[in-house]
Amino acid sequence: MAAREGISGRHAVLQALRSGREVHSVLVRKESGEDPALRPIQDEAARRGLTIRYVTEGDLVRTVGGSGQGVGALVAPLAEHSAKDLVLLARAQGEEPFLVAADGIEDPQNLGALARSALLAGAHGLIVPERGTAGIGAGAMKAASGAFSLLPVARVASLPTALANLRREGVWILGADANGGKAPWKLRLTGAVCLVLGSEHDGLSQQTLDALDERVCVPTPGGDLSLNVSAAAAAILFERVRQAEAKRT
């Protein structure tokens, strides 16, 4: 039997269907079958020739690992990429690589939110270490609202090694560091860049810090508390969007 994994939540399932990702089955909680919010999923499943299975909540949880919004699906695993693949993908589109990397992010919801922000900001891919970082399971998929069906992901054995290889490809390595760094708007973010985000508690590992070209820190004039990792990422990512738009006008 072909490998498959479970996802749950309306956005995650709908994006999987629309993206062309291989979907083996769609499951809807019986009590949610008449929910008008599920109509786009039902229509897209029909377009792809998939018969929706209406199941109990218990069966939904057992099959896909969650019951978010009463809908889930069994899908093919994400395509495997290397960090260099992401660079080549960007350059094939005639663009400078714009990548995001996660260093020890443990909360699946934060990883999912990071993927969502990266996709919406126009990143070409996400780099995730094989160890020490949350897996891309049901929790991350739900928080990403379908982003993982559209955003290429590279799983790497060693993030510092991957960053060193990216530098050899001409990619500038920028790390978000709550302990200090330049404000995002004081840096030129529109070239070939990989933005690295650290763990919720410890930030970037020393090995990753040693691999950086520059550090960036989002100022928080309202107090000494630090931003959540996904919030800090969004602030930096969309400063890059602002700079890119300003460059075009």
Question: Which functions belong to the PLM regions below?
Answer:
Residues 32, 60, 77-79, 105-107, ...:
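Short glycine-rich anion-binding loops that position phosphate/pyrophosphate groups of nucleotides
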